[in-house]
Amino acid sequence: MNPDRLPVVDPDKLPRVELELMNDVHREEIALVNALGEQLLTGADGLVDDAAISQCLAAWISHTQEHFEGENRLMQIHGFPPFPVHKGEHDQMLTQLTQIERTWQQDRDAAALAKFLYETWLPWFDTHVKTMDTVTAGFLNRVMQS
């Protein structure tokens, strides 16, 4: 993964799932991630705007918390059998996001934040959408239509 590549996630290449509600949330998240990526790339050119990066990071994390809470709620309401596994992935990523935000607030290291974004979060998100979210969306789409 190249941390100098924008967008971080090409919205046209974002894997789609069977439940449009989930696709909408993913598109919102990608917009926030790409805004953060733009700030980080600007920072790599020596024009670091700590406040803008902090704002983008906080908005992304807040959205991700709401995203995961919404998915978790739907899985619980509709009795999704592997809910604990899917929720466990959400919990792990939220822990990592909280840690990277804490690290950013302490060190203001744009390179470390970019490394996390491209090397940790991006492959996780891609795999999560293609596996966990695809299965979950298929299940939810079926039970919500019946």
Regions found by a protein language model. Name each.
Residues M1-S146:
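Small-residue-biased structural context
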